[in-house]
A protein has these predicted regions:
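Residues that scaffold the ATP/ADP-binding catalytic core of kinase and kinase-like folds
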Residues: 13-15, 53, 126, 134
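Active-site neighborhoods of divalent-metal-dependent phosphate/nucleic-acid chemistry enzymes
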Residues: 77-117
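Amphipathic alpha-helical segments within well-ordered protein domains
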Residues: 51-55, 70-73, 90
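Active-site phosphate/pyrophosphate-handling residues
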Residues: 9-10, 51, 103-104
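Acidic, PIN/NYN-like endoribonuclease modules and their adjacent C-terminal/linker elements
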Residues: 3, 107-140
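A generic structural signal for short hydrophobic patches within well-formed alpha-helices
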Residues: 11, 47, 123-124
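Short, well-structured N-terminal submotif of metal-dependent ribonuclease cores
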Residues: 1-42, 57-67, 137-140
Length: 140
């Protein structure tokens, strides 16, 4: 079966349906995946880029973005190699004011039991995440 690495621009055209020709082509590709004719591979970086574009350029609400992308990741014909971490990160993103990358780090740290080395005090919001002891240095 044919597999495609999904570029964020195709994902965005499908989600936004904002360009007659490109959105239609994207919808056709997603339909092929849903019909089992191909597999679309959505990477964690593709999700991160989509989150950034949808929230910064298109000014969509965090909750809307997180829910739309979470639904996308579990669709038939879509593979996300880091699905559990990405879904956890989207849940954290929706429920906090942390940026998506920090939410992804928190998801990875929680799943692996590895502490996060960061000066970002926002990560303290995630009770299931251990942070590096910065030796009394104030986190920013």
């Amino acid at each position: 079966m044919k597999k495609y690495l999904l570029d964020t621009n195709v994902l965005l055209r499908f989600l936004l349906d904002d360009h007659a020709e490109l959105s239609q082509a994207a919808a056709g590709l997603f339909q092929q995946a849903a019909d089992g004719k191909c597999i679309l591979i959505l990477t964690d970086l593709g999700v991160a880029e989509a989150v950034w574009v949808l929230t910064s350029y298109y000014k969509l609400e965090r909750q809307t973005v997180a829910e739309s992308l979470a639904k996308m990741i579990v669709k038939a014909g879509i593979q996300c190699p880091t699905q559990e971490s990405v879904l956890d990160a989207l849940t954290r993103f929706k429920a906090s004011n942390c940026d998506f990358f920090d939410c992804y780090l928190a998801a990875q740290a929680s799943a692996s039991g590895v502490a996060v080395a960061s000066f970002d005090k926002d990560l303290k919001k995630f009770e299931d995440v251990s942070l590096w002891d910065a030796g009394g240095v104030e986190r920013g």
